[in-house]
A protein has these predicted regions:
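Short, charged/polar connector segments at secondary-structure boundaries
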Residues: 1-106, 112-126
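Conserved small/polar residues in nucleotide/adenosyl-binding loops
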Residues: 201-203
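Amphipathic, charge-rich alpha-helical segments that serve as recognition/docking helices
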Residues: 47, 91-186
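Long, charged low-complexity interaction segments
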Residues: 190-191
Length: 203
């Protein structure tokens, strides 16, 4: 395979490459090799990690080239590290038989970790409505928590408006769209699955 074709193929793996901001930050931080057994998924991680064709391609890429972009994780109080960015890379590496992974370890608050986790995963090409719904809700709650701590005198309605807009920022959507997605989290699982299945028809 021509070298250019390999590069083009690798560039399509959104779970291997992170955002430009994250890459710049990684250059300023030390990458550590962490045993896979010490890495744990993010609590209530809203994005599915599926053993589909895309994962199979990622596993083959990891076997050939390794994990090209480090994971981001934070220390857990009980030991080990909680993955913030890189759940698919971790799963692919496990299937590929790797024993350690390159990881950037950061000390982060719960809210800051939620925001980074959501933002890094929203770079993926195909995201189910249910994933967006719970991700937006988690980010909205985290932003509200941060706002409540920094400005306890702000009116609740105004704070909600700003928070919705903050979640929408960078996604090319409006605060109203964010609210519509978040309302999906109130659906029973059967109805939420129907919404996801309908979206897959149009992918």
């Amino acid at each position: 395979m021509p070298k250019s074709s390999v590069n083009a193929s690798l560039s399509s793996y959104d779970d291997i490459f992170s955002t430009e901001e994250s890459r710049q930050e990684e250059q300023r931080e030390q990458v550590r090799q962490i045993p896979i057994g010490e890495l744990f998924p993010f609590k209530n991680h809203p994005f599915k990690v599926l053993d589909d064709d895309s994962m199979s391609d990622t596993v083959e890429s990891v076997k050939q080239y390794g994990v090209l972009s480090p994971l981001i994780a934070r220390p857990r109080p009980k030991g080990g590290y909680e993955i913030i960015s890189g759940h698919r890379r971790q799963h692919a590496a496990e299937l590929a038989g790797l024993e350690t992974l390159p990881v950037i370890v950061r000390e982060m608050s719960d809210d800051a970790a939620v925001i980074l986790m959501v933002d890094s995963n929203l770079q993926r090409e195909h995201i189910l409505p249910s994933e967006r719904a719970f991700a937006y809700k988690m980010k909205l709650d985290a932003i509200k928590n941060q706002g409540a701590r920094s400005d306890l005198t702000s009116p609740q309605v105004a704070s909600k408006f700003r928070s919705d807009d903050e979640v929408a920022k960078g996604q090319g959507i409006s605060g109203d769209t964010v609210r519509r997605f978040i309302r999906l989290t109130n659906l029973i699982p059967e109805l939420l699955d129907m919404v996801d299945n309908l979206s897959l028809i149009h992918i």
